[in-house]
């Protein structure tokens, strides 16, 4: 495999995001009908576990537009992965940044688009040292 075909440390898909029109109804459907494990909810978003891949349900944007599905790829080091992709011509719309402090880790994201304008995010869950 030559250097041009390396995947820059992209891991498994860590999360897929889809738009829903009624969050409570969708939570009930995915949890009660499909049997997915409900993880947590924040304003306008709900998260489920689907065999180790997180499913994010989100309400449409404030302007009423649905967002396209989003692929989130796990990476060990988000800055190194972003730097490697930038060297390949990727222009990041959102630079690596911590977006959530969860119970045991900090969630970092960085986003760009594919040629069809689909959103792709790098995600890194950085453990916090316990005190």
Feature annotation, model-predicted:
Residues 31-32, 49, 86:
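Alpha-helical segments within the soluble intracellular
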Residues 1-24, 54, 69-71, 126-131:
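N-terminal beta-strand motif that seeds the catalytic metal site of vicinal oxygen chelate
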Residues 1-9, 12-21, 46, 64-131, ...:
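Vicinal oxygen chelate
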Residues 37-69, 119-125:
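Conserved short beta-strand elements that form part of the metal-binding/catalytic scaffold
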Residues 34-39, 72, 98-102:
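Short linear motifs in intrinsically disordered
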Residues 22-36:
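Amphipathic alpha-helical segments
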């Amino acid at each position: 495999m030559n250097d041009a075909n390396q995947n820059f440390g992209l891991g498994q898909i860590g999360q897929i995001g889809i738009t829903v029109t009624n969050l409570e109804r969708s939570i009930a459907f995915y949890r009660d009908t499909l049997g997915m494990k409900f993880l947590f909810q924040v304003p306008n978003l709900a998260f489920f576990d689907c065999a180790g891949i997180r499913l994010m349900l989100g309400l449409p944007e404030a302007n009423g537009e649905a967002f396209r599905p989003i692929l989130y790829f796990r990476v060990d080091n988000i800055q190194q992965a972003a730097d490697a992709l930038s060297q390949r011509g990727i222009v990041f719309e959102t630079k690596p940044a911590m977006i959530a402090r969860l119970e045991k880790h900090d969630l970092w994201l960085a986003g760009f688009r594919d040629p069809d304008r689909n959103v792709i995010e790098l995600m890194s869950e950085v453990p916090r040292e316990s005190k």
